[in-house]
């Protein structure tokens, strides 16, 4: 307040000095000091008289201002320019939108679990993962991010992993409010509780799911601190049709899951319009699973972006990809792509146990055939399976395939045992087995990599699929 009064007095003094200078009146000094009040000679007009006339133009050279006392210029609103600059500095910056890195999720191979090694650009599908309603929101309205999901996301992003997140819509405090007297689930994952029904408080579930997607969508608004790139892919539950005596993921019928899918889809898209929503993984193409999913697909148009199928130790060569493609087509999803989010190569039911070498052979033919039938991403279950999986040889086969053709940009089945993969480098990779041979158009030396990763150079005309192998024509990808 004192500084403002001093400034006003100083301005008045300067005005007096300027008026006298313009009228030619003599003062005691040749120049007017900013600290001296000028005297007014007799017979001259007073400053008050001057103020009644038109504005006075003050020559710049007339007034000398002590620079140590000069005040910053003010704008037309009277605000100090320095204050304006400071206000501008403190205005919040526009949200920084994070881009999806080109090297994240560039591979068509993924793995069930929380980490991956052996190839770059791969996908993970944590199972069950940490995106459980009651784990993140242990009490209504109270969120715990840091030690449930943030730490995991930080680690995934330090390793440049693409993630498919499974959403679990269960919180014990919610289920207890309306489902406490219903049968309990058997074999549920830890952290989910024992009642796995449709949320009692739908609005609370929507609020939670919206907050989850918002925290990791990378739009610069309410994001996780330190987020490097968005999480975009969300799967609504897992195998909801699995309701057996040993394993249960959901305790409701098809119509209930359809309702859950619709509600979840809207919530996810409201937080992130660029998100990709997958239906919960269909456990297989066996009739009991098809019967559960048929009415869902008939009512789910516009409520999922990618189909989702599983194949666990089935006798189906291509992990149900062909059958599932037909299933989607028949139910109005002809243009919808799909992923195989669980692929376990194992001995099919009622068949003689296969050796590790046989399982490794099936691994190469299964992945190649599934991609050829339309699968876009395939997640290897491998050792994540409670049985231990098909063994280290099969794991090696998946790794070699991911390294060699994982970033393919096109795939074409040329025969039932000959598949062509187009690579971004311009090279071509063929996968062949059961004594298949290369097309006649291929000649010269080619690189041959068998299902165990053994590599050599051969003449194209001499190559045959006596065992499953990949043939690289052109520069190695």
Predicted regions and their residues:
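N-terminal substrate-binding region of glycoside hydrolase catalytic domains
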Residues: 83-231, 235, 241, 245-247
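Bacterial N-terminal signal peptides
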Residues: 9-19
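Active-site cleft segment of glycoside hydrolase catalytic domains centered on the general acid/base Glu
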Residues: 179-304, 311-327, 331, 348-365, ...
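Aromatic- and carboxylate-lined catalytic core of secreted/periplasmic carbohydrate-active enzymes
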Residues: 360, 364-439, 452-455, 464-470
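Bacterial N-terminal signal peptides that target proteins for export
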Residues: 1-9
């Amino acid at each position: 307040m004192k500084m403002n009064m001093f400034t006003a007095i100083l301005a008045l003094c300067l005005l007096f000095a300027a008026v006298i200078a313009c009228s030619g009146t003599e003062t005691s000094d040749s120049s007017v000091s900013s600290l001296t009040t000028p005297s007014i000679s007799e017979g001259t007009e007073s400053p008050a008289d001057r103020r009644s006339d038109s504005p006075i133009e003050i020559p710049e050279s007339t007034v000398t201002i002590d620079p140590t006392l000069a005040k910053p210029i003010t704008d037309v609103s009277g605000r100090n320019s320095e204050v304006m600059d400071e206000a501008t500095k403190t205005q919040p910056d526009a949200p920084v939108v994070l881009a999806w890195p080109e090297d994240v999720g560039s591979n068509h191979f993924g793995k069930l679990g929380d980490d991956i090694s052996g190839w770059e650009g791969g996908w993970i599908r944590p199972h069950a993962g940490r995106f459980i309603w009651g784990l993140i929101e242990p009490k209504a309205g109270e969120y715990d991010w840091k030690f449930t999901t943030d730490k995991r996301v930080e680690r995934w992003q330090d390793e440049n992993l693409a993630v498919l997140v499974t959403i679990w819509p269960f919180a014990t405090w919610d289920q207890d409010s309306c489902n406490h007297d219903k049968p309990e689930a058997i074999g549920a994952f830890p952290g989910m509780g024992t009642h796995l029904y449709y949320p009692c408080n739908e609005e609370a579930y929507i609020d939670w799911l919206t907050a989850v997607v918002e925290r990791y969508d990378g739009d610069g608004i309410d994001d996780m601190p330190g987020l490097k790139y968005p999480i975009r892919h969300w799967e609504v539950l897992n195998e909801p049709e699995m309701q057996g005596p040993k394993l249960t993921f959901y305790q409701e019928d098809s119509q209930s899951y359809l309702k859950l899918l619709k509600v979840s889809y809207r919530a996810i898209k409201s937080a992130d319009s660029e998100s990709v929503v997958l239906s919960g993984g269909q456990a297989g193409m066996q009739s009991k699973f098809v019967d559960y999913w048929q009415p869902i697909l008939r009512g789910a148009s516009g409520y999922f972006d990618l189909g989702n199928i599983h194949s666990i130790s089935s006798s189906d060569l291509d992990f149900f990809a062909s059958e599932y493609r037909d299933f989607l087509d028949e139910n109005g999803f002809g243009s919808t792509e799909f992923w195989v989010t669980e692929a376990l190569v194992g001995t099919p039911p009622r068949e003689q146990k296969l050796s590790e070498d046989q399982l490794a052979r099936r691994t190469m033919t299964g992945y190649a055939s599934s991609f050829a039938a339309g699968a876009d991403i395939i997640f290897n279950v491998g050792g994540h399976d409670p049985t231990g999986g098909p063994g280290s040889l099969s794991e090696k086969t998946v790794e070699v395939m991911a390294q060699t053709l994982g970033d393919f940009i096109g795939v074409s089945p040329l025969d039932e045992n000959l598949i062509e993969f187009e690579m971004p480098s311009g090279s071509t990779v063929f996968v062949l087995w059961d004594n298949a041979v290369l097309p006649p158009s291929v000649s010269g030396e080619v690189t041959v990599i068998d299902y165990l990763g053994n590599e050599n150079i051969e003449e194209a005309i001499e190559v045959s699929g006596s065992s499953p192998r990949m043939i690289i024509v052109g520069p190695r990808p």
